[in-house]
């Protein structure tokens, strides 16, 4: 008789383009056969949700929006869990972290796991209080970096034994270009001989694009530098106006959300991550895996990845002068770019590959399943 597979439900509000969503995509692609992954989109599937569906993994879209104004929507999540009867619920991002875990606890799902990917000091007090209550019945929260774990323990007053660091991972195959640098630049309208920096991030306050634009405008030595801005978000129009106001519109290229990241990285000479707060930005890790030197802010998990002066340059968050100085340093020193880029690739490939991440998650699942074997119940077909 074939052993029953362990059903794992991955819950998120929506699977848009982002690091946490990429983690779920990596898991459903690489989990060993003893696990049966299912994905539940509380609100909408999003582009990553559609990619997950193409792997053959069941993807449910509930169309719900739980919160203080719609607390009854938790009931919809409960019904889904009641129908699917998973042994493990693993939540990602804030809405699922609170309402998904609440539904899983109320439905007595045997193993409940959360994920914390950001240091977010401005989290609302009610969310912090909810996290503290939910931790009493949460079996583990996976933190994306040591600094994220340390902050979460202070913020939520969690039991340290229940918060485990598992560094996020990157599918470095995404960094392989299908086109040449010259061809990509031609398609983007970037001169073949230009110096090109890039940022891949959602267009939100967190990611600090405005400070990068200010830095570009501040230094005459950066007049040849073009910037590829990859990603979408609510600040798109504001940032376009800011670039225009600083007379950068001919050098700042807004590309929107893209999946051809290998081609775009091949067109860059350096990568910039000017975030004000973070967890562990996977686009930065991917860029390092592509052999690019990085300029990044020294927040959260970034200094755990970028070694200042060896694999990139670290600057304080929101410091335009420091950011302009770092950009100028790399823009005017091609050997340093080459040296740091090679060191960056060598540093991240062994530490942040998908195989290592999936192995760590599987060990966590196995440990919790063995520890709480008395809770287990058969999955519903």
Language-model features and meaning:
Residues 34-36, 187, 191-195, 209-253, ...:
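A conserved nucleotide-sugar
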Residues 66-72, 150-187, 352, 372:
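Acidic anion/phosphate-binding donor-loop and adjacent secondary structure
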Residues 113-144, 150, 157:
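A conserved, positively charged/aromatic
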Residues 308-309, 313-320, 329-334:
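Conserved acidic donor-binding segment of nucleotide-sugar-dependent glycosyltransferases
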Residues 293-296, 306:
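Short hydrophobic beta-strand element within catalytic cores of glycosyltransferases
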Residues 257, 276:
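Aromatic "clamp/platform" in nucleotide-sugar-dependent glycosyltransferases that forms part
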Residues 18-29, 195, 199-220, 234-241, ...:
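A conserved mid-protein helix/loop that constitutes part of the nucleotide-sugar donor-binding site
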